[in-house]
């Protein structure tokens, strides 16, 4: 944990340095995948454990509500982004964990929901969470699109994902913070494209 060794100024400086090293092309591809899912009417599933699990919930909430302006949220004619966090059905997760195995909690949901062309965003700081890997492996076999968010050395997730964004850093807290920080740019980019505003405004 970097905060044990670094004071506030050094910690913020380190965070700034790490952000500058991020693959910005991968950030754009991340947004592209989500926008394509919206265009094609596909579902987006987001999953992770612990802090990454709450990030999955946060991303799902933002993508569900904030890809359209609040002024049109009552307009039923507007096309919506179909997005679901697989971390939020506590009863289902507990039932699968208790009756089958904890490494099945995401893949069992995908078996019910997932279809070819849907997008799976898999978040794992270590890249080695068995329940995340099982879900990604299933998604790959069934022609879903898989995009991983990883830290440390990327683990196995970085090897099996179809695409992804990697934070090369051995500090879980900062990795999780960076994942969510970058997501907010992705959200803004997708919003701008769907609504033809900002950089995507019609000339």
Stretches found by the model and what they are:
Residues 87, 124, 150, 165-173:
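Short beta->alpha connector loops at strand-helix junctions that form conserved
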Residues 22-40:
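A short, well-structured juxtamembrane/interface segment
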Residues 36-113:
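Glycine-rich, small/polar surface segments that engage phosphate groups of diverse ligands
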Residues 1-22:
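Generic N-terminal amphipathic, Lys/Arg-enriched alpha-helix
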Residues 52-57, 128-135, 157:
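Short glycine/serine/threonine-rich phosphate/pyrophosphate-binding segments
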Residues 149-161:
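Short, glycine/polar-rich helix-capping loops at beta-to-alpha or helix-loop-helix junctions
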Residues 41-42, 117, 143:
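Glycine-centered short loops/turns at secondary-structure junctions
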Residues 112, 174-203:
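A charged, well-structured terminal subsegment
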